[in-house]
Curated annotation (Swiss-Prot):
Phylogenetic classification of the source organism: Viruses, Riboviria, Orthornavirae, Duplornaviricota, Resentoviricetes
Name of the protein described by the UniProt record: Non-structural protein 3
Pfam families: Rota_NSP3
Region (Interaction with host ZC3H7B): 170-234
Coiled-coil portions: 166-237
UniProt KW Hydrolase keyword: no
Organism: Rotavirus A (strain RVA/Cow/United States/WC3/1981/G6P7[5])
Amino acid sequence: MLKMESTQQMASSIINTSFEAAVVAATSTLELMGIQYDYNEVYTRVKSKFEYVMDDSGVKNNLLGKAATIDQALNGKFGSAARNRNWMADTRTTARLDEDVNKLRMMLSSKGIDQKMRVLNACFSVKRAPGKSSSIIKCTRLMRDKIERGEVEVDDSFVEEKMEVDTIDWKSRYEQLEKRFESLKQRVNEKYTSWVQKAKKVNENMYSLQNVISQQQSQIADLQNYCNKLEVDLQNKISSLVSSVEWYLKSMELPDEIKTDIEQQLNSIDVINPINAIDDFESLIRNIILDYDRIFLMFKGLMRQCNYEYTYE
């Protein structure tokens, strides 16, 4: 049965594309900074670092494993998907994830990235406007959740009394972001649905191709059986022909030496391989014609010695 590994191939393609994007980003940065570089050296170093990070962090194996689970589910095998679902809902998994998060937090603190910086980076992102010196500050999902839970406060100590502050309608902003999120979610779902349909079509084409191959193999087997039957029939016919010639030879009034010579030639015929048998028959017929020619020459010489003439009618 043919296996569909489209998701694994797509995940591998995304990883390779990410590596190529990393190389392009590195070389573009060096060019903008006016730094001369060797492309092969940059390519080798980025590749070494990229492969090490992807392998050491387990990200590559994690992506390929999830892709393999999706392929198995598309092929009707839901065991791996069920195990992953149970694993994600296990309390031990949750505890281990919390432990990993705590380790990452401590690592960031040891690098000088304190809690304030981590929270701000998690709540906001900055988007540069092309051709402008200003920037757009975007709120993340965490910021939206904090607003909903009432965990956002305004410190008036940083605002002067005479300063006019523009009121931001966070509700409308949130509704706009929610609409954008729903629109993006719909587009992603449409693309995923389209990809699943294409994957199913590819799978159907594979099954159809497999059926065609099976039919061709069956036809080849039938032709092989027919060829084997023809070969057996030829072997039987050749064996019967040799036996018939031997019986006819014994009924002739020829000297025993001639009979023995012809019988030896008949026994040397390969009745197993029809091609060799035809070659042996050709050799036998040539020898008979040659003997007949020699007898005729002897008879012709004898007639001349006796002063006789011969004619063909």
